[in-house]
Regions:
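Iron-sulfur cluster-binding cysteine motifs and their immediate structural context
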Residues: 4-6, 177-190
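Auxiliary alpha/beta "docking" domains used to position bulky ligands
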Residues: 1-171
């Protein structure tokens, strides 16, 4: 048990997200995150990050286990819930690498590469494509069980594994809760 709450499999092709992603960049929605403008060829063609990639294994690791504990007094500074505790990059990379080695032990030597916010990966789009959740009006991946309180990690592998069902339907519908509570009013109208 690696501690992941969900594991999904999908193909590496995310080219159908290219136009939408680039239009958000051109509109300036990425603010000062200039790295989102770079390496677009790799972003839209995941197999170029790990040649021979046939399957992307996506994992979800929840970081908010006690929702009641997340309530913070308004007279104190706030710390993002994901920043409390150990560095998730290290935790997830270790677990993903272990998972990759376990798969490798079962399926002859395979090539794999693990990612946790470490490369130009369209992880939300890959996760949406796999059926793990849907991208909400707040641009986060939303999941029925965890909301948006989770980390994503990926393993690119050369093994053609069976993939999960297609993307979930967007369940936001007419809901605007995330837009209403955003303290900076950062999101344009959908």
């Amino acid at each position: 048990d690696m501690g992941f709450q969900q594991v999904h499999f999908t193909r590496p092709d995310v080219s159908h997200y290219q136009a939408q992603h680039w239009s958000q960049i051109e509109a300036g929605y990425h603010a000062d995150m200039d790295w989102l403008e770079r390496n677009t060829d790799v972003r839209y063609h995941p197999e170029s990050l790990h040649p021979g990639t046939q399957t992307v294994i996506l994992v979800r690791l929840d970081y908010l286990m006690d929702r009641d504990a997340a309530v913070i007094a308004s007279d104190r500074g706030d710390i993002a819930q994901y920043a409390v505790g150990r560095d998730y990059h290290k935790v997830m990379r270790r677990r993903l690498t272990q998972l990759g080695h376990e798969i490798q032990a079962l399926l002859d030597p395979i090539g794999f590469r693990a990612f946790v916010d470490s490369a130009p990966v369209l992880e939300r789009q890959l996760a949406e494509q796999s059926g793990m959740g849907w991208i909400g009006k707040n641009t986060l991946l939303l999941n029925d069980e965890a909301g948006s309180w989770f980390f994503l990690g990926e393993i690119y592998t050369s093994v053609p594994l069976p993939t999960d069902s297609s993307a979930q339907s967007n369940r936001c519908n007419n809901c605007r809760a995330c837009l209403k509570v955003c303290p900076t009013d950062a999101f344009p109208e959908p």
